[in-house]
Amino acid sequence: MRRDFDRQGKQKKFTFLMKDELFRKKPKNNHFSWSVDETKFLDSEKVKRLRKVLTSAKDKAIKENKIVPARNWFMVELGLFTGLRVEEMVNLKAPDLHLKEEQSSLSVKKGKGDKSRTVYLPETFKKECLFYLNWKERTFPRSDYLFINRAGGQLTKRALQKSFKRCLKLAGLEPHYSIHCLRHTYGSFLYKSSNHNLRMVQEQLGHSSIRTTQ
């Protein structure tokens, strides 16, 4: 059986991602055929607010050479544009990002169930990745991990989750959201933007079964 999401056609399949339309446009209505609990993902207005606040904090942090605001900005951007699980985020290293290929991607070495997969990146996010990698290399060159603490050590899952809670507070958003909501948000917008292509969502999120995606 021919797979809906074939690797040969990935460039065309991800045109919508390249245009960065996932979070720029508000959906025409709030109905999703894919059943998702609305308390578990951010709508486009909340995404816009969160990104704006964190981008401003990041720009200030870069000038003052502070790691935490810049790291938190990239944490949220990565979650929104890749849908990675929190354990996948904390284990991500600089060499796992492939930004010189025609279609940029990142490699998840050990995802859920110890499975590996490739996640494709929108062109606009590639620029953000390059910016963060270059800045981190200048600031903490000794660590390959993308998410590090002030001492340069690998950040834990718990620490990343706490950082996200602080991001919510900074943006004035409801505190009930967990960092996993970034994954739900990515999946929801990807589903809408891909004309309800569940197979594509399954591939990107790394679900072993399409029933999990549903």
Segments (PLM) and residue ranges:
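Conserved catalytic core of the tyrosine transesterase superfamily
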Residues: 1-214
